[in-house]
Amino acid sequence: MTSNESAVSQALGVHSEVGRLRKVLVCSPGLAHRRLTPTNSDELLFDDVMWVENAQRDHAAFVGELRRRGVEVVELHDLLAQIMALPEARAWLLDRKITANQVGIGLIDAARAYLETLSPRELAEYLVGGLATSDLPEDFRSPHLALARESTGAREYLMPPLPNTLYTRDTTCWLYGGLTLNPLYWSARHDETLLMKAIYTFHPDFKGSKVWWGDPERDWGQATFEGGDIMPVGNGVVLMGMSERTSRQAITQVAAALFRSGAAEHVVVAGMPKLRSAMHLDTVFTFADRDVVTLYPRIMDAVHTFSLRPGDRAPGFDVVDEGSTPFVDVVAKALGLPKLRVVETGGDAYASERQQWDSGNNAVAVEPGVVFTYDRNTLTNALLREARVEVVTIVGAELGRGRGGGHCMTCPLVREPVDF
């Protein structure tokens, strides 16, 4: 690696969807997924329980292949353990996690005292994996614990597990030279962004990062924003899905913040149906090369597209209704391309619906024309290869049980721009 390449790799920022991926955040399956049961999986947003050992094996293979492709991979548990070795970071996070509203007024002292005895690595495991009422040793138990144990579902935890941390894409978005700290749609995921704020506040590799918008310590009301809906594609353009999880209220605030800072010049909004199967834009649309996208036409053909651009009048941007112009055509024009080559979900009506459900269009690129996808989506993968895209497969039988693929499982931290 040249000195110039080294400098690029260390400058946090994401400048495209397919430029060379230099650094990425992932979260390995672990304790949080061992906490999933048939009783609580719906509440924790998983369709089924995981075979955790196989999920760990498959995730490790995914990470290993990313590294072989030259990507620096950092892992959420590791980053948390590193900052939990810092007394000020530990105090900051436990002050916000161990509260009357979280653990109950009668268990604050006992839960805090127990967590303070743990090593940084053990504490990181509990912060992601959850603290069950049964985890407190006898020395830290009180009469209040019996009351807590009568609770059901995820509420039997003093700190609920966060299994959706597997999908690191959603909690933060690097948009060119800064990031957003996202208020997530479901309450089961809210504390994920708090963990990320701790990392960005205290970890030496991330301190000083520019935050465009968002703060998990605020109530954002109807303004919800998730990274699976957000794509900084280059040329100052950001794609945003207005979906089940990402609201108009958040999109307009983020767009205004990006325009004020000069970070972006055009936000293309995809108005989507509110469906779990298409919860985010990246479940039905991703880039595979500079001019190649893979998409699920049954959803994308019905998308209503809007363009937001900086404006002189309040609230600081203008809205253009793109009418009947297809989303892909609006995106192509924004990037200065005559058109985008489209790879649709493979198979007949039945097969394509199954493949989309199994994240067939949820590709993540490591460089132009090289993507990772789940192995089970054989028909879509074959079509990508016909379009001269190199497809590296991930075993997806277990990792996809929360409805996410390679794009969902990666939060790019450093990605190079591309020329259009």
Curated annotation (Swiss-Prot):
Documented EC number(s): 3.5.3.6
Localization per record: Cytoplasm
A GO molecular-function descriptor: arginine deiminase activity
Pfam families xref list: ADI
Protein's UniProt keywords contain NAD: no
One annotated Gene Ontology cellular component of this protein: cytoplasm
Pathway per the UniProt entry: Amino-acid degradation; L-arginine degradation via ADI pathway; carbamoyl phosphate from L-arginine: step 1/2
Catalytic reaction(s) noted: L-arginine + H2O = L-citrulline + NH4(+)
NCBIfam families: PRK01388.1 (NF002381)
Protein name, entry field: Arginine deiminase
